[in-house]
Amino acid sequence: MACNIPNQRQRTMSTSGKALYEILGLHKGASNEEIKKTYRKLALKHHPDKNPDDPGAAEKFKEINNAHTILTDMSKRNIYDKYGSLGLYVAEQFGDENVNTYFMLSSWWAKTLFVIIGLLTGCYFCCCLCCCCNCCCGRCWTKSSMPEEDFYVSPEDLEEQIKTDIAKDMDFPVVLQPTNANEKTQLIREEPRSYCTDS
């Protein structure tokens, strides 16, 4: 089965942001009410059910519907007004919030800056060494303020520390027993909280 592909030139992406307004017959700064009113009028005129003999009516109706969908969505409309259909394509690929970043990074000065920094750092070799090897194999690592010998504790000292901690705990006997807890026990005390640190 052969596929019939027309030999039409594919539409190019505009950057002016006027084609959708021209489809609806409006100027670029048209209000939402004007867009809705014009859309209803053109949709009724070019609807495929009202024009069964016209094969181009369905295509025209699709264009009108697409223009209405984009121009009534404020986010897409702002992108279209600023960057044209190329901006809508970028928004579809990378998200609405990344359109400005894409066009900023694809500008001539951003590309030039990228090339200059690449040349100055030896094709980013210095940046790679700094990140991967911490600036020439650790010469820039911070030194510890305390020497490592202070961290060693002999077993005898550790045993002595444990015995003194136990002896201190014996000086304060447990006086109160915990209250019985059940499902109805409140987790928060009923008395008002006091944030005073003075006893």
Swiss-Prot record:
Listed PROSITE patterns: DNAJ_2
PTM field: Palmitoylated.
Location(s) in or outside the cell: Membrane
CDD domains according to UniProt: DnaJ
GO cellular component, one term: membrane
PANTHER family given in the database record: DNAJ HOMOLOG SUBFAMILY C MEMBER 5 HOMOLOG, DNAJ HOMOLOG SUBFAMILY C MEMBER 5B
Name of this chain's protein: DnaJ homolog subfamily C member 5B
Organism: Bos taurus (Bovine)
